[in-house]
């Protein structure tokens, strides 16, 4: 079925705002809750923001690249948008759920589509204890940080930290160390998608750590739990032959 009601959103970048004016004038602007499809104009950062802000609507989101990074975006063109939406392939993503506890006892819940990362927040290296499904797997990881990512997020920060690119259909998560000092050669692990990963910060006052879920940070954490959230799903639309699986393969040969 060809979507008739389209809701457009755009980043604050001038090129994205210009595209918003052009596309809304040409195809009409529908309130997002009433739309058949949402079109996000910007880069990957804005796409993540849009997915977070619209996750309760269960409406597919089609990105058009008007930013600097476009891994999650389709090419921008003013013509034939309804036809492209009708022919698009849909990918369903389940995000990560993060529960972070601070030294003051505050509890923060965040959703992350790409990754949850723990990063040292001072000059001292972070000391982390890692547990998986209630069993301690590493008593002490000395590092700049660590992250857990989804397959969709494996080409982002995870890949920059020398983590593996995961097939989009794989029921696994990547746990990747960021600049590990001890164990020096330990890079991380592949875990089942159902795993509950827990990080406990050792000597948190001397070695402060922050947790970050897709750019939303919590400072001075003492523990962080991460798991897949099956109750939340994000629907992404891609042009035929340019879905996430193809993009993940292509990224490895750049």
UniProtKB/Swiss-Prot annotation:
Regions that span the bilayer: none
Uppermost EC category: transferase
Cellular component, GO annotation: cytoplasm
Family annotation (InterPro entries): ATP-NAD_kinase_N, ATP-NAD_kinase_PpnK-typ_C, NAD/diacylglycerol_kinase_sf, NADK
Enzyme Commission (EC) number: 2.7.1.23
Main localization (coarse): cytoplasm
One GO MF term: NAD binding
Gene3D superfamilies: Probable inorganic polyphosphate/atp-NAD kinase, domain 1 (3.40.50.10330), Probable inorganic polyphosphate/atp-NAD kinase, domain 2 (2.60.200.30)
UniProt keyword annotation of ATP-binding present: yes
Cofactor dependence: a divalent metal cation
Gene Ontology terms: biological process: NAD metabolic process; NADP biosynthetic process
Record-annotated active site: 44 (proton acceptor)
Localisation: Cytoplasm
Catalytic activity: NAD(+) + ATP = ADP + NADP(+) + H(+)
Keyword Kinase: yes
Entry superkingdom: Bacteria
Record keywords, A-Z: ATP-binding, Cytoplasm, Kinase, NAD, NADP, Nucleotide-binding, Transferase
Residue numbers binding NAD(+): 44-45, 114-115, 144, 152, 155-160, 179
HAMAP family, sorted: NAD_kinase
PANTHER family: NAD KINASE
Family per record: Belongs to the NAD kinase family.
Main function: Involved in the regulation of the intracellular balance of NAD and NADP, and is a key enzyme in the biosynthesis of NADP. Catalyzes specifically the phosphorylation on 2'-hydroxyl of the adenosine moiety of NAD to yield NADP.
Protein name: NAD kinase
